[in-house]
C-alpha cells in the first residue's frame, strides 16, 4: 500500500442498485488496489466509533433523522463528508411508496442537513445539480458507471424471435404505461416474431404473452444474468417532470453495456447522452412515437446492430467502472488532503443514544411489519424480507473482504 492510504468509511441506508453502483463497487476496487482503506456498513449498524477511524465519511441517500448523530459527529470532529445523491427526494409525491420512505417532512429536513453540511455533494443530473447547489456551493455532477467485467456474451440463435426487454427495480411501476399501447399493438401484429420480457414488475394482464423475470437483489448477479439473456431491444420510458429529469441514465448504461439497442423517452436524462439513430432512439411520450420506434428496430436488423455496437463503444469510452473509480479517488484525495488529521472523538454518549437495546429494536419493528402487510400484502412483504436477507449476506461478505486492509495500522 502507499505510505498514506486514506481511511474511507461509507455509511449506507441499505444495499440497493444506487448504493452498490455509486459507492460499494468503486470503494471495494480502490481498497483492493491499495489506493484507500475502506469500510462499508449500514447506518442501522454504524457507530460514531466508525467515524473516529475515518479520514472521510461517505453517505448515499441517507435521510433517517434518528441516525443524524452520525453526520453530526463527523462534522463536529472535522472529518470531511461526501454525500452522494441520485434521486431528487424533494420532488417525490409524499403519498407515493417512495415518498413514504424518503419524502416525509422530517426526512426532507434531514436531507437538507446532509446537503448543507457536506464537504462535497455528488449528483448525476443537471436538475439535481441546481437543487443541491442552492444549499451547498461544493456540488459536483459526475457520470455514473457500469461494470463491464460483469457483462456476459449471450448465445444468440440465428432465426429466433427479436427479444424486447423492459427492466426496472420498481415493483410499483407506472412508467411502463407510456409504451404499453405501442407494445400491445406490435405484439398483436408480429405474433411469435417478437418476444417481450419484463424484468422486475409483473406485466399487465392485457399482455399475457410477455415473459416475466423476478427481481435479482444482488446487482452484479443481475447484470450477469441480464447480459446473458440475449435481449436485442430495450425500453426506457421516463416521465418529463422535475423528479424524473433528476434521475441518472442507468438504463442507457445497462442497455449499452449489454449490446441492447435502446428506445428512450426524449427527456434530458437520455437526450443528454443518447445520439439519436446512433446510440439509441429518442421518442416522444406518446403511443404512436413508441410504436414507430419499435417497428423500426424490429424491422431493420442493420440499424439495430449499428446502435448496439455504437452504444457499447460509448459505454466503454465514457461510463466504465475504471473511469468512475478515478473520479472517486480524485474526490477522496481532494477532500482528505495528503496529511492524515489527528483528532480525538468522544463517542460514548453518542453511542448510547444511537444503540438501542435489541429487544427495543425488535418491538419497534412489530408495528412496521404489520403496516407493511396491510399496505403491500404477503407477496410484497416476502419480497422485502428476501431483499433484507440478501443485503445482510452481501454486507457480511463485503466486510469480510475489507477487514484485512481496514485493520492494518
What is each model feature region?
Residues 1-67, 401:
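N-terminal pre-catalytic "stem/leader" segment of glycosyltransferase-like enzymes
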Residues 10, 14-33, 145-151, 157-229:
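Conserved catalytic-core segment of nucleotide-activated headgroup transferases in glycan assembly
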Residues 73, 89, 101-120:
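Membrane-proximal helix-turn-helix segments that form the acceptor-binding/catalytic region
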Residues 91, 174, 219-257, 263-274:
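Nucleotide-sugar-dependent
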Residues 116-152:
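Donor nucleotide-sugar binding/catalytic pocket of nucleotide-sugar-dependent glycosyltransferases
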Residues 274-277, 281-287, 296-302:
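Conserved acidic donor-binding segment of nucleotide-sugar-dependent glycosyltransferases
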Residues 296, 303-318:
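A short, well-ordered alpha-helix in the C-terminal region of glycosyltransferases
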Residues 316-317, 321-408:
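C-terminal amphipathic helix plus adjacent low-complexity
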